[in-house]
Amino acid sequence: MDAFKQQLEQLSAQNQYRSIPDLVHQGRYIMRENRKMLNMSSNDYLGLASNENLRQSFLQQYGGNFPSFTSSSSRLLTGNFPIYTDLEELVAQRFQRESALLFNSGYHANIGILPALTTKSLILADKLVHASMIDGIRLSQCEFFRYRHNDYEHLKNLLEKNVGKFDRTFIVTESVFSMDGDVADLKQLVQLKKQFPNTYLYVDEAHAIGVYGKNGLGIAERANVIADIDLLVGTFGKALASMGAYVVCDQILKECLINQMRPLIFSTALPPFNVAWTYFIFERLPQFSKERSHLERLSAFLRQEVEHRTQIMPSQTCIVPYILGENEATLAKAKDLQEQGYYCLPIRPPTVPKGTSRIRLSLTADMTMDEVKQFVACL
């Protein structure tokens, strides 16, 4: 036990010790230690999680005869329910693709897809892809390289040097990057993919689904490249106010995943009740255009104000990094903002590169411009 204790002491000395906070949620506010704070760290981008009207409308449609609260099994055994297929068909239809497949979480999706599909393959991943994608790459045991962040000339060089050595190549990226809030150029990635044989594009839209595109289908919809992305992954646990994840892809890839993806095969499926809620929200996704427009106005204002103070602004989205550099300064500023009534959280290495500790600000559509202006005055 002494070795574990020393590890924790070392983390504490480096200002990298983490703990799970005791929180009470009140709409867009957080109660912690008897302090009420506006939640500036939520991924509930459209503000749907606290929308009581939506919740009541969903519950009323069942009249007390709710779907099961557990699946009790893997979908490949006895845990499949009609609502799963209904949601997969709806997702595939909205994206105008052959098929969709559900997962228990975005993490499950990202650690399972690549190991299931990448035998004798090369993986080329953006340097800043999410930890879950890195874990999936490691589990695949494939040869892999990481290209410099959003540097497609570097990616092209790696493709030219390596593609002929492998049966298949997978380019892996996020569309909206979770810590910097910047956006991948999906059109350019599609063009690159098409230049090389047996090359597949895998895009994680976790922070884009619901928020971008005319119908809320993400950056791929906005860039008009949905049909060109081989594996388009998204989560229901952020803007869509639910849980779980999906991939849209060709039917043949779906069948391969069903047969070879261990997190899918060996996990108890999501509760049908939650999948029904996801269906309810996803069905209404095109209706939230006002929320998307309002969120963009709030985001543009906050990005401008933070850039004015730090001279650093990689973001193009509602994820706005307030980069302070060192751990101590970041922890102190987060504490100061919490004392002023704003629930802001410090993000430190190894989540972000050393020397780029920041407060990750994420806006939601249920905030007002006055609230954001009042927050800016505290920066």
UniProtKB/Swiss-Prot annotation:
What does this protein do, in the record's words? Catalyzes the decarboxylative condensation of pimeloyl-[acyl-carrier protein] and L-alanine to produce 8-amino-7-oxononanoate (AON), [acyl-carrier protein], and carbon dioxide.
Tell me its EC number(s), please.
2.3.1.47
Q: Name one GO molecular function term.
A: 8-amino-7-oxononanoate synthase activity
Subunit text: Homodimer.
Name of the protein in question: Putative 8-amino-7-oxononanoate synthase
Q: Could you tell me the Gene Ontology terms of the biological process aspect for this record?
A: biotin biosynthetic process
Q: Which gene encodes it?
A: bioF
Residue positions annotated to bind substrate are: R18, H130, T351
Instruction: Give the Gene3D superfamilies listed for this entry.
Output: Aspartate Aminotransferase, domain 1 (3.90.1150.10), Type I PLP-dependent aspartate aminotransferase-like (Major domain) (3.40.640.10)
Q: Which UniProt keywords apply?
A: Biotin biosynthesis, Pyridoxal phosphate, Transferase
